[in-house]
Amino acid sequence: FWLFTWGQAESVIANDWMPLSYLFALVALFLVPFRTLPSAGRTRFLQTLRRVSVGGIAEAQDGKFGDILLADVLTSYAKVGGDLFVALCMFITPGSSSTGRPDRSCGGTLIVPLILAVPSLIRFRQCVIEYLRVKRAPYKESTGWGGQHLANALKYSTAFPVIITAAMLRLADGEAAKAACYRAWLVAVLINSFYSFYWDVTKDWDLTLLTSQRES
């Protein structure tokens, strides 16, 4: 694309359809059942995506790890999803271009925050489902009473204040309101970042760097 446009601003804006055509082709590979391509993997992926998209999670023997992995991928790419929506919105908006300066209010002020929040909401619901499964099952010392799943759900819930305060900051009118929203956003970001860092190090990676088990 950059070789075709030579990096010239006018050409980049005029040919905004080129980078988006790749995205449409990628989606088509997943959705259109081409006979020349293997269908088993695509079918399995779409089934998992359908289950995960509503916050569902399979049993351990039915692919629970894959559901968690896909939901975590969606969480990691939440910002990318929001940016893609903005690009598509600007592409179909008359007088705008998807390769121009991003207009994050395109399509309304609530859609992008909702797109950012959905992946975290999916993982939050999955954690709650896992907690309820532990509560219904006979007690096992290896799984405990399910508190770890609630703590994991709390980790994903800390993303919501970040998204809400960021949206409020974008809509704030006046320096005082912007300063207050910025401080609230900064506190929310710090809580989310430190909680996520602690959880990843001690739980997901099983490191003792931040625990009392660390050897001196």
State the predicted function of each range.
Residues 1-215:
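Alpha-helical, bilayer-embedded segments
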